[in-house]
Regions:
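Active-site loop of short-chain dehydrogenase/reductase
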Residues: 5-6, 73-74, 119-132, 142, ...
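Conserved glycine-rich cofactor-binding loop
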Residues: 14-15
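The beta1-alpha1 cofactor-binding region of Rossmann-like NAD(H)/NADP(H)-dependent oxidoreductases
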Residues: 51-62, 94, 207
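Substrate-binding pocket helix/loop in short-chain dehydrogenase/reductase
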Residues: 88-89, 96-101, 193
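Active-site helix of classical SDR
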Residues: 112, 150, 158
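Alpha-helical segment proximal to the catalytic Tyr-Lys
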Residues: 117, 159, 163-167
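C-terminal substrate-recognition "lid" of short-chain dehydrogenase/reductases
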Residues: 170, 204-228, 233
């Protein structure tokens, strides 16, 4: 068990933004606990992979327990796991609702609770969640009620937790992306999706990684919802 390096827990870490975050934090010298349903073991001794469904409280408990057992502490939690189901409001099924709420909200709630318990032991820590600019700026033709419901709730919880734990050394922030080039968006969609942003193009995974790394080192910033969205939240 090592306590000499900072330790970050990253959910949804197997691909896209999550995989970028694993790389970015390792380059900063962090020990990384990476979790997702499909995560594979790493040959890097400073990366601990823990497979499981983050919506399940038992997975959250196992991730935190193994993080502390292997690395001795938790400095940062990145709540990156999330799913997006785009449908007209009246076409959402009960299964859609349950799945999105479970991953986006339960996947935030349980592991954040447990991480804060560990952070309080050191009177220091940082939680940063990935939400969406659609919460603040709905787009015609992109039906997103479930994303707005769940990620909007996390934005609100971010501010509430930031105030609750401000005097206990724990900061809580969120990054609110626009549409990012990830494996979920085929290359044939990039031009159309890029046109939804005032800057005229989609964001890159590294845009989100760098925003999260900035927040992790910005000790005077808490309760912030940082929009990384090519101007979407500012208007059209």
């Amino acid at each position: 068990m090592s306590t000499s390096k900072k330790v970050v827990v990253i959910t949804g870490a197997s691909q896209g933004i999550g995989a970028g975050l694993v790389k970015g934090f390792r380059e900063r010298g962090y020990q990384v606990v990476a979790t997702s349903r499909s995560i594979k073991p790493s040959s890097d001794p400073d990366i601990l992979a823990v497979a499981g469904d983050i919506a399940d409280p038992q997975t959250a408990e196992r991730v935190i327990r193994e993080a502390v057992a292997h690395f001795g502490r938790i400095d940062t939690l990145v709540n990156n796991a999330g799913i997006f189901v785009a449908k007209p409001f009246t076409e959402y099924s009960q299964e859609d609702y349950a799945q999105v709420v479970a991953t986006n909200m339960s996947g935030f709630f349980h592991i954040s609770q447990l991480a804060i318990v560990e952070m309080e032991k050191n009177a220091s820590g940082h939680i940063v969640s990935v939400t969406t600019s659609l919460v603040d700026h709905a787009i015609d033709g992109v039906p997103s009620v479930l994303a707005s419901l769940t990620k909007g709730g996390i934005n609100a919880a971010t501010k509430s937790l930031a105030i609750e734990y401000a005097k206990r050394g724990i900061r809580v922030n969120a990054v609110s992306p626009g549409i990012i080039k990830t494996p979920m968006h085929g290359e044939e969609t990039h031009a159309a999706l890029g046109s939804l942003h005032p800057v005229g193009h989609m964001g890159e995974i590294d845009d989100i990684v760098q925003a999260i790394l900035y927040l992790d080192g910005a000790n005077f910033v808490t309760g912030e919802i940082l929009h990384v969205d090519g101007g979407q939240s500012a208007g059209h």
